[in-house]
Amino acid sequence: MSIAYISHDKCQLHDMGAYHPEQPARLSAINDRLIATGLDMVLRRHDANPATPEQLLRAHDDTYVDMVFAKSPQQGQVSLDGDTSMNPHSLEAALLAAGAAVQG
């Protein structure tokens, strides 16, 4: 038996700082736990492909998708709402994470 594990190293670049729960350490902790439990032996690792706009629109309305793309910063950080912030790598990381869900 094998289990698909779909992710991408670029997701580690969505780093909103130590104060924010969305940080690369969470992905590292998941990988460490998979290794510690031996589950990594049955994983088939795959790099995620980014979700397409059409795939995003299956879960989000076009106004929201357009807003996220428009607010993606070239530098620094921007806040989309009280819980969601973006850095220059966040859009790509989000597209890869959504793509992983579609692939899975």
Which ranges hold each PLM region?
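HDAC/HDAC-like amidohydrolase catalytic core signature
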Residues: 1-104
